[in-house]
Curated annotation (Swiss-Prot):
GO terms for molecular function: alpha-N-acetylgalactosaminidase activity. It comes from Bos indicus (Zebu). The keyword Disulfide bond does not apply. Placenta. Removes terminal alpha-N-acetylgalactosamine residues from glycolipids and glycopeptides. Required for the breakdown of glycolipids. One of its GO terms (cellular component) is lysosome. Coiled coil: none annotated. Keywords: Glycoprotein, Glycosidase, Hydrolase, Lipid metabolism, Lysosome. This is Alpha-N-acetylgalactosaminidase.
Length: 12
């Protein structure tokens, strides 16, 4: 689940 936490830029 890449809700923004696993992504480079923390959007979530």
């Amino acid at each position: 689940l890449e809700n923004g936490l696993l992504r480079k830029p923390p959007m979530g």
